[in-house]
């Protein structure tokens, strides 16, 4: 009887190329935004446009990170899960740049004004809370932290993303004055991803039960 043929594992070169494509895809929006800023194509209010697009890309990448596990399960491509860390770190970078642009360009590092905004403007309060919760996730994203904390504790900490994303959606919704469709769409995507997780969890539990 012939032995079953083993699946050929991707080579290191293939892995490197895929990682390179993921990095390029995550970095491309920032490069395009920088070019548009240099070319004066950010509209009548370039500062607001810059701040908003950085934040929106941060939110998009957070949602992409949450979508990787469902995509890996549905497409039967478990190796996709390896890219969650890279996507998550890029999401943090975009959110950090969003905050830096707001504090540095819009407020000229006026910390007193920032504190007033946090206390008096709900969308700033929610956005700052979401960013503060993102920091420990970015810091503990390495394998070393998984070992130090233990897989269970590390996983519990990183479930904060399930709070961070709705905070980001609410921040965006309260920020916009006219077209609320984008934050509503992002919120709907988040709800769909959470419903999939509930369904998948119940399906897995029913399979494991006697």
Swiss-Prot record:
Keywords: Cell inner membrane, Cell membrane, Electron transport, Flavoprotein, FMN, Heme, Iron, Membrane, Metal-binding, Transmembrane, Transmembrane helix, Transport. The lineage of its organism: Bacteria, Pseudomonadati, Pseudomonadota, Alphaproteobacteria, Caulobacterales. It is a multi-pass membrane protein. This is Protein-methionine-sulfoxide reductase heme-binding subunit MsrQ. Part of the MsrPQ system that repairs oxidized periplasmic proteins containing methionine sulfoxide residues (Met-O), using respiratory chain electrons. Thus protects these proteins from oxidative-stress damage caused by reactive species of oxygen and chlorine generated by the host defense mechanisms. MsrPQ is essential for the maintenance of envelope integrity under bleach stress, rescuing a wide series of structurally unrelated periplasmic proteins from methionine oxidation. InterPro entries: Fe3_Rdtase_TM_dom (IPR013130), MsrQ-like (IPR022837). The gene is msrQ. It is found in: Cell inner membrane. Heterodimer of a catalytic subunit (MsrP) and a heme-binding subunit (MsrQ). Binds 1 FMN per subunit. Binds 1 heme b (iron(II)-protoporphyrin IX) group per subunit. GO terms for biological process: protein repair. GO terms for molecular function: electron transfer activity; FMN binding; heme binding; metal ion binding; oxidoreductase activity, acting on diphenols and related substances as donors. The keyword Acetylation does not apply.
């Amino acid at each position: 009887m012939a032995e079953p043929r083993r699946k050929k594992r991707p080579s290191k070169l293939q892995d490197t190329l895929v990682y390179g494509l993921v990095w390029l895809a995550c970095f491309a929006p920032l490069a395009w935004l920088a070019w548009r800023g240099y070319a004066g194509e950010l509209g009548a209010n370039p500062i607001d446009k810059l701040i908003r697009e950085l934040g929106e890309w941060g939110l998009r990448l957070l949602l992409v990170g949450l979508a990787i596990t469902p995509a890996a399960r549905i497409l039967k491509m478990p190796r996709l899960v390896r890219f969650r860390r890279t996507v998550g770190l890029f999401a943090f970078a975009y959110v950090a740049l969003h905050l830096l642009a707001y504090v540095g360009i819009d407020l000229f590092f006026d910390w007193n004004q920032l504190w007033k905004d946090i206390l008096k403007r709900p969308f700033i309060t929610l956005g700052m809370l979401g960013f503060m919760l993102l920091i420990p996730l970015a810091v503990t994203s390495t394998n070393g932290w998984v070992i130090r904390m233990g897989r269970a504790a590390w996983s519990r900490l990183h479930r904060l993303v399930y709070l961070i994303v709705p905070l980001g959606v609410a921040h965006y919704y309260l920020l916009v004055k006219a077209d609320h469709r984008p934050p509503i769409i992002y919120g709907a995507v988040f709800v769909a991803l959470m419903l999939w997780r509930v369904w998948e969890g119940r399906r897995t539990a029913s399979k494991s039960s006697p």
